[in-house]
Regions:
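Catalytic active-site module of serine/aspartate enzymes centered on a nucleophile-bearing elbow/loop
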Residues: 257-297
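Conserved hydrolase catalytic core segment
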Residues: 96-135
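Alpha/beta-hydrolase active-site loop signature
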Residues: 41, 65-69, 129, 265-270
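Hydrophobic, aromatic-rich cap/lid helix
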Residues: 182-219
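Active-site loop/oxyanion-hole signature of alpha/beta-hydrolase fold enzymes
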Residues: 61-100, 104, 276-285
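Short beta-strand/loop motif that positions the catalytic acidic residue
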Residues: 227, 233-235
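Conserved HGGG/HGGXW glycine-rich cap/lid loop of the alpha/beta-hydrolase fold
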Residues: 14-72, 76
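Conserved alpha/beta-hydrolase "acid-adjacent" motif
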Residues: 240-247
Length: 297
């Protein structure tokens, strides 16, 4: 089952963020409300299979972060505050106290819980938090230039290398070849895409905002000592971006009400639907831990 098939039969809705921007979402299931917040280079559809795995026990909401699907565009002043306001708008509309987030989505969920948004439990899959700015934000200038020049494949390769997310084969091959392969993959995806499919090409402009979010929150680990929500830190034991493990370990010691669970054989995309750009996704493996955590009173 692919993400498009998994979303068949889901209903749609929307919430209005503090600045008036529409935040669209998919909805499925019956029971207490749970919001699943996707990470960078993803959309609401990226966790459709995880939503279905939880839908017999929860009403699951899958919001599109800005610039994707049914949600409105980024504004000039977009930043962490905006992301928290967008998530808060959805949790308020859904009357949700339970949030799962992955990567930057996990970071946003933790920040929203810290801001007093009424979130009671957060399941955070490999939160994308930098212990310091370091080398993981230096790619943004080149990325913006390449995207502005219409070199989408080049921009995506720049972000993959800058965030230590490039597949091993891409790290070894000449950059022009990696760009050519990425461009061919995008063209193939474009030909097959339906009107609601969120393709790599459509997602590319959103990547910069995740990079800016990383830069804005770099070095803020101490702030998370203020989070009063119960937190389940989730992750895989495979190769991750280099900054994930230090943050994962630091958060487990900083968050006052946290526990951790790690999954053998999973990587940074472990909770997301499997597909051409995420061949290692195994949401069915992650779902039981989330279900158990959210079922606790």
């Amino acid at each position: 089952m692919n993400s498009t098939q998994a979303t068949t039969g889901m209903t749609t809705g929307s919430a209005t963020s503090a600045d008036g921007t529409t935040i669209g979402y998919l909805q499925v299931g019956t029971g207490p409300a749970v919001v699943l917040l996707h990470g960078g280079n993803e959309s609401a559809r990226s966790h459709a299979q995880l939503a279905l795995a939880l839908a017999d026990a929860f009403t699951v909401y899958l919001p599109d972060r800005r610039g994707r699907g049914r949600s409105g565009p980024h504004q000039a002043d977009h930043g962490l505050r905006t992301e928290v306001e967008d998530l808060t708008a959805v949790t308020a509309a859904a009357e949700a106290e339970l949030v799962f987030g992955v990567s930057t989505g996990a970071l946003i969920a933790l920040c929203a819980a810290r801001a007093g948004s009424g979130i009671r439990r957060v399941a955070a899959y490999e939160p994308a938090l930098l212990m310091d700015a370091g080398r993981y934000t230096g790619w943004l200038g080149r990325f913006d230039q390449e995207l502005a020049a219409g070199k989408t494949a080049a921009a995506l390769i720049t972000s993959l290398h800058g965030l230590d997310l490039a597949p091993p084969a891409f790290k070894l091959m000449p950059r022009p070849l990696a760009e050519a392969l990425t461009n061919a993959a995008m063209k193939s995806e474009d030909r097959k895409a339906g009107p609601e499919d969120v393709t790599m090409r459509r997602l590319a402009p959103t990547v910069r905002y995740d990079g800016l979010l990383l830069a804005e929150t770099a070095g803020t680990i101490a702030r998370f000592a203020d989070v009063t929500a119960d937190v389940l830190l989730l992750g895989g034991d495979m190769q991750r971006p280099g900054f994930i493990r230090p943050a994962f370990d630091a958060l487990s010691q900083t968050l006052p009400r946290s526990r951790r669970a790690e999954f053998a054989g999973l990587d940074h995309g472990g909770s997301s639907d499997p597909g051409p750009t995420n061949r290692s996704g195994q949401p069915a493996v992650v779902a039981p831990a989330i279900r158990s955590f959210f079922a606790q009173q």
